[in-house]
Structures are given as structure tokens and as C-alpha cells.
């Protein structure tokens, strides 16, 4: 019974993490195409989403570890779980990189209001966001396929 509750909690937490990270590149693109008010909203909303993604990434890691230890530890789970844990750690690090990039751009944009600052980091945000989405695809596949 405890395992099932932990599993449901883990899936719910992971869904929030996925949802908060998947929309970031599109939000940035739409915010830059719109006017000043929308760009200001997009800048703060993107940072909020990155922070939320980081928090739920850590919670996913913790709930995943709880599931592993509920099963008896790492020697009792498959290689797919080991690989997924490593990829989750990489995604958390990527999120930290995204936050650092965006925080610098956010501060400069708030000081100057210059959209070109955001255009300059858009490519990096999309690139790191794309890496994160690729890792998501692999991790979700590993949760279904047993190795």
C-alpha cells in the first residue's frame, strides 16, 4: 500500500515538473513577439516557471529515491531506474543553468527595458530547454521499457 501511494505521489510530482518546464521556450518566443507589457509579464513568469520546475525536480528525485528504498535499495531496481536517476540529476543541473542565464537577462531587462537582451539569451534558453525535453523523452521511455 505504501508503495502505491508513493508511486502516485511520484507521478503527480513528475507531471507538475514536466508541465512547468515544457512551456518555457514557447512562452519566451510569444513574449518577445508581443508588446512591452507582455514581455515584462513573460520575463517574470518564465523565472517563476524555472523556479517551480527546480523545486518539483528535487521533489521528483526525493520521491524516486523513496520508491527505490521502498523496494529495498538500488540493487533491487533495474538499470533503467539507475539511468533515469542520472538523467534526472542532469535535468536538475540544466534547470540551474537556465535559471542563471535567465536571472542575468531578467536583471538587465528590468534595468533597461531593452528587448534585445532577451533576444540574445533566447537561443540559449531554447537550446538548454530542448536538451531537457530530449532527456524527458528518454526518461519517460525508460520508465516503460525494462532493461
Regions found by a protein language model. Name each.
Residues 1-147:
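Polytopic transmembrane helical bundles with strong interfacial aromatic enrichment
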Amino acid at each position: 500500500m505504501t508503495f502505491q501511494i508513493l508511486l502516485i505521489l511520484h507521478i503527480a510530482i513528475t507531471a507538475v515538473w514536466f508541465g512547468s518546464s515544457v512551456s518555457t521556450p514557447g512562452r519566451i518566443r510569444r513574449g518577445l513577439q508581443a508588446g512591452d507589457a507582455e514581455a515584462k509579464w513573460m520575463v517574470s513568469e518564465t523565472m517563476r516557471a524555472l523556479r517551480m520546475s527546480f523545486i518539483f525536480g528535487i521533489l521528483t528525485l526525493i520521491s524516486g529515491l523513496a520508491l527505490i528504498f521502498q523496494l529495498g535499495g538500488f540493487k533491487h531496481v533495474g538499470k533503467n531506474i539507475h539511468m533515469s536517476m542520472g538523467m534526472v540529476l542532469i535535468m536538475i543541473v540544466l534547470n540551474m543553468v537556465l535559471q542563471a542565464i535567465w536571472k542575468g537577462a531578467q536583471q538587465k531587462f528590468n534595468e533597461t527595458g531593452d528587448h534585445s537582451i532577451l533576444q540574445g539569451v533566447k537561443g540559449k534558453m531554447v537550446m538548454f530547454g530542448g536538451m531537457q525535453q530530449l532527456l524527458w523523452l528518454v526518461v519517460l521511455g525508460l520508465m516503460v521499457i525494462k532493461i
